[in-house]
Amino acid sequence: MRNLRLGTRGSQLALWQARHVASLLESSIPDLKVEIKTIKTTGDKILDVALSKIGDKGLFTKEIEKELLDGEIDIAVHSMKDLPSELPPGLCIAAVLEREDPRDVLLSHKNYSLADLPQAALIGTSSLRRIAQLKAWRPDLQLVDMRGNVETRIRKMKEQDLDGIILACAGVKRLGLEEMISDYLPAHLVLPAVGQGMIAVEARSDEQDVLKLLSRINHQDSFLAGQAERGFLHELGGGCQVPVASLAELQGGQLHIRGLIASLDGKEKYSGSSDCSPPEAEEAGRELARSLLQQGGAAILCETRK
């Protein structure tokens, strides 16, 4: 019997994702036993400051990646959207599971749909990407900074009597809370974060036997979409502190990728799309990013990062 040590954050959602990966591996590989190790990250420790103000990449991954590089664990499981656009030397994304619904959703204990939200509604979110796009759609919305895991945010929504909160659909569904969803935010209204809805499995680049094991659970269409979106993000040098978004989808054998750069107040935004063959996924994402930078996105990002 072979043992595989899996590192993950300790939130309910992170543990769900880790157990899901472990289950897939154990069911596809006889005599494999996966041990789960929880690791606390910087992002888990700093809960009273907006992510955009901490200003560090890898907030939810750095400590896990250190243990991976040091040989303390064999693989790491992440929400793809938490991974920095550039991985540490010696590490790679070895597998991506089939993508869950990438959209954002509205949760409202007052049962508001998007169309029902009152003037100056109080909406909780800490994402600059969501804030910029929501302001572009409804400048009247009062956006309240909100950090914490899914359960914490739901509790804060009720305690602070907010009209709603915006979360990633995937996390809500994976925790079995789908009945709490009041409405879905279409991608043309709020484009998702890079990698939203994807579970990524990271490994050491030189561990060929581990890479081979992980290839058994890889979903190639999702992997390619992730490459395109991460290519877009990498070209922008992005992370949690910049209001950018991207979504890639395979349609009829072609990869369709959309991208967005927006100002924090939602008054300026540059968006575009392109199509490519799957082998060109990453470069297509980079090329789309370069196009948006030239249109005016570079000035927005420069201003945002001041």
Swiss-Prot record:
Coiled coil: none annotated. One of its GO terms (cellular component) is cytoplasm. It comes from the Bacteria. It catalyses: 4 porphobilinogen + H2O = hydroxymethylbilane + 4 NH4(+). Gene3D superfamilies: Periplasmic binding protein-like II, Porphobilinogen deaminase, C-terminal domain. The keyword S-adenosyl-L-methionine does not apply. Pathway: Porphyrin-containing compound metabolism; protoporphyrin-IX biosynthesis; coproporphyrinogen-III from 5-aminolevulinate: step 2/4. Its EC number is 2.5.1.61. Binds 1 dipyrromethane group covalently. GO terms for molecular function: hydroxymethylbilane synthase activity. Its cofactor is dipyrromethane. GO terms for biological process: protoporphyrinogen IX biosynthetic process. Keywords: Porphyrin biosynthesis, Transferase. The keyword Transferase applies. The modification S-(dipyrrolylmethanemethyl)cysteine is found at C240. It holds the Pfam family Porphobil_deamC. NCBIfam families: hemC. HAMAP family: Porphobil_deam. Monomer. Belongs to the HMBS family. The porphobilinogen subunits are added to the dipyrromethane group. This is Porphobilinogen deaminase. It comes from Syntrophomonas wolfei subsp. wolfei (strain DSM 2245B / Goettingen). The gene is hemC.
